[in-house]
Amino acid sequence: MTDVTGMNDVTGISDVAGTTGTAKGTNVTPSDPPADAGAVFNLLGGLVAAQVLGALAELHIPDHLADGALTAEEVAERAGSHPQTTYRLMRAASSLGMLDHQGQHRFRLTGLGRLLRSDVPGSMRSMALVQTSPGHWQSWAHFTEAVRQGSTQTKKALGMDLFEYFARPENSAEAALFSQAMGNMSGLVTQGAVAALSTAGVSTVVDVGGAHGDFVLALMEADPELSGQVLDLPHAVDGARAEAEKRGLSDRFSAVAGDFFQEVPSADLYLVKTILHDWDDAQCVTILRSCRSAVNEGGRALVVELVVGELGRPDFATVSDMAMLAMTNGRERDLTEFDAVFTAAGWRRSKTYPVGGGYFGMELVAV
């Protein structure tokens, strides 16, 4: 975004931000107000950056560039968009590092931009789309009120909570995007968790709220003796069945539409990945109690979540916590807060290990 804001030019921004007691042309240090203002301006530009990535994804521009560089006019013809504004969008995307502007309106994908293709492992296209879709975007408009009131204002933004919104037939496409985004984002985390988790003595696994089943299916691929199941809302389970069939695992897999607050199938192992952060403590206890009531003797649960670390240390979990406040009743938690939830639900944390991307696996045993 430096082409637009000029924020890399410290003396240039001094005309905008002002420099108390400093004449034009005077050298300034990074701690002086102009540089600080530039850093803040770039943070505020995150709103624009998210929309640029969302538009790239929706217009399939990275897919159109998959085979090599094209002009903005060629991309516009394929995308069905206006040539001049497509050029402006692609120019902005190049400032964000998503595209490489080669001159003469010609662009190619960068390594970052490749992640917005629809056909690559770990694709973030669905995430770019869902983050800029109404269910997320409208909720952020009420964020300050959420801070004032102490709880999400999603009902004010959407007329209902986020998961009710996704369950409505008219929002099925957005709900499917959300499920796909969660599955795509879990790739590295899933690999780390599968590598760290022992399935000795485990025959049956239930992926609680598992969307398209990426986690349990990866575990089944690693252990051919396992039978797996996904429990999720109706809009997600069809995708789980399709994914199991694609991987050749349908004979050991089933998907059940249900409500994890009410009842879960019996199993030796429950996978509860990035579920608890969507809910308040009482709701988390209810989910885990459902698992505790149904677990087979000697069974376990694996919870995978971000864990808030030491205060004052840069921590993605604390930023993600703001998204939880904006859109859900949930929160990111530290280990002490997790342990309180586990204990109240009849579990004890027996192991904790990093699984990638700032996420941790927390193995639970029934007590």
Region locations from a protein language model:
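Alpha-helical subdomain
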Residues: 2-4, 19-103, 199-200, 204-367
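Short hydrophobic transmembrane-like helices used for membrane targeting/insertion
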Residues: 4-16
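Conserved Class I S-adenosyl-L-methionine-dependent methyltransferase catalytic core
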Residues: 30-31, 37-58, 63-69, 77-78, ...
